[in-house]
Amino acid sequence: PRVRRQRQMCIRDSIEAKAKEQGLEIEFDIAKSLAKQSNSCSLKIYNLSKATADKLERADTICILEVGYSQDAGLKRIFIGWVTDCYSYMSGSDKVTEMKLYDGHVAIRDSIVSLSYAKDVSRKKAIDDVAADMGLVVTYADDCEFTTFANGFSFVGAGRECLDKVCAGTDLEWSIQNNTLQIIKQGGNTNVQAIKLTPESGLIGFVEKLLKGPTKAAKQKTSKKTTQPKRDKKAGWNVKCLLQPVLNPGDLVYIDSQEIKGWFKIESLKHNGSYSGQNWYTELEVYEIVPKE
């Protein structure tokens, strides 16, 4: 059984200096999804060293949080993000530092791209170039397909808006996961079969069926092709398990419970952890994989 927890925080500033903090009491709440907004992390650290606390006050500071189990695969990256808010206060005899982190924050907020291509250029080429300009590594699901710009393509503006435009024309969707640009099919998945969850491997309690009506986006008529209404037809479930840092939205997870059994797509997740406390859980919103009609 995986009972011995591990944690580590790494601070990296704009000049690539690094400071690692281990052995501290930490608490975190992480929310990740396939939305184009940044994933977020609320992090609380007790008795952080002054040197590391000073680094957190610098512009463009990146915080990397790793957690895991010493009797399993050890430390795994659970979140990487830019510090947008940070403050410290005394609570009894403890100095508490609270911060808010956002994944891909600088890339989404600041990146301006200028691209121009001749006719018949692949949309993959455009995505690769946008990712490079945004300072992001890009990963593609292995079933992604790319059309071309028959009449060429040019764009000047925010990188995120360029990604919207390029992906919309080839039935793809993008998100940023751990500072990596993730590209999958609209309504698809990464095809990464992450883990298998059973009561013996960390599944907790009963899975809960999700009852959702059509989203507002599904009701609106747009000129762009969208598969969002189809996604609403799939059966969804809320699943709780022991903390699983390797899981990301878009991945596949195998669930073996009394209620459901099979592979499901992770649409969103929340990690909640307290190193010395009771919380050390992951909550998943998953959907069954339905063949295309």
What is the predicted function of each stretch?
Residues 48-134:
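Surface-exposed cap/loop segments at beta↔alpha junctions
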Residues 80, 124-128, 160-164, 236, ...:
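Extracytoplasmic/secreted envelope proteins and their assembly/folding machinery
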